[in-house]
């Protein structure tokens, strides 16, 4: 058995998958005594192949996660590389894997979120940890191909636009498609908070067995709580559908960034607008979104 969030390599990957592996310390579990920790011999990962059709797909799922696993097995926690340093060290190994035709997963593009907010205009400045790759993109909802527009430097955006970016290796092999939205909008107006407002969030627990957040409200209510953060109250067990509501204090006008991480579905609604859609049945996935607030 392995911690599934880190080491079930058949789980879908995102921008945090390798980072979480590198940050893992098998000796950091407070449930183990110093005497018990002496018996930790190493680390392992699992890959269940019932739904994996080809060896090429297996390669895609385990590389470079398998290399990150090896890194934490033989390197002391104090000297483990950062994600950026890890990919820098891998550059010559990626070239070797190109020659060997290994179907590795290209590192994620950097420089944008799932939803990006701007007021007048903004610039997309992409980077890829893997040198020698091409980045191509579309704005019409189609999947980028080798014939799509080439990203060749900073890209100015002046209107709300949906982008699909895709990286291509030197041999033409494509990466996953990265979808992002750039939203042009003025600062959202502040609202007047109730006079008797108390700190925290109101959390309503529903006895919910479904997969979509939109269906939670129709399920029976089992309890109401006040929580200090977005988290599951200790009393909540079994079938869980949580609806949390509250107010956000905005100290100054600006572009605010929100991260939404969940194992299965979650959504973030702000001022009645669905801002972050991380819904549906899935393993641990994080999305990051922005909104202009005053």
Locations of regions flagged by a protein language model:
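Beta-strand elements of well-folded, non-transmembrane domains
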Residues: 49-51, 246-252, 262-266
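Substrate-binding groove of N-acetylhexosamine-processing glycoside hydrolases
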Residues: 1-135
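Short beta-strand-plus-loop segments that form exposed binding edges in beta-rich domains
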Residues: 294
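Short, compositionally stereotyped local motifs that mark structural "simplifiers"
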Residues: 81, 87-204, 209-246, 255, ...
């Amino acid at each position: 058995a392995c911690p599934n969030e880190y080491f079930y390599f058949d789980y879908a990957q995102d921008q945090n998958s390798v980072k979480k592996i590198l940050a893992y310390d098998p000796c950091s579990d407070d449930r183990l005594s110093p005497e018990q920790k002496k018996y930790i011999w190493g680390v392992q990962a699992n890959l269940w192949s019932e739904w994996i059709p080809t060896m090429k797909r297996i390669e895609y799922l385990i590389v470079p996660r398998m290399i990150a696993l090896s890194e934490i097995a033989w390197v002391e926690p104090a000297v483990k590389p950062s994600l950026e340093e890890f990919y820098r060290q891998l550059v010559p190994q990626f070239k070797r894997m190109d020659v060997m035709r290994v179907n590795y997963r290209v590192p994620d593009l950097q420089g944008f979120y799932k939803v990006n907010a701007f007021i007048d205009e903004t610039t997309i400045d992409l980077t890829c940890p893997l040198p020698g790759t091409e980045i191509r993109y579309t704005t019409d909802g189609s999947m980028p191909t080798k014939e799509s527009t080439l990203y060749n430097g900073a890209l100015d955006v002046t209107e709300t636009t949906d982008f699909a970016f895709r990286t291509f290796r030197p041999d033409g092999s494509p990466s996953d498609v990265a979808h992002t939205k750039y939203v042009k909008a003025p600062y959202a107006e502040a609202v007047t908070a109730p006079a008797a407002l108390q700190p925290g969030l109101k959390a309503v627990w529903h006895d919910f067995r479904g997969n979509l957040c939109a269906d939670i409200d129709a399920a029976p209510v089992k309890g109401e709580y006040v929580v200090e953060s977005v988290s599951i109250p200790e009393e909540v067990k079994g079938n869980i559908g949580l609806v949390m509501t509250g107010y956000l204090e905005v100290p100054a006008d600006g572009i605010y960034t929100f991260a939404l991480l969940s194992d299965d579905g979650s959504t973030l609604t702000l001022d009645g607008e669905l801002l972050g859609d991380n819904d549906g049945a899935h393993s641990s996935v994080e999305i990051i979104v922005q909104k202009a607030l005053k």
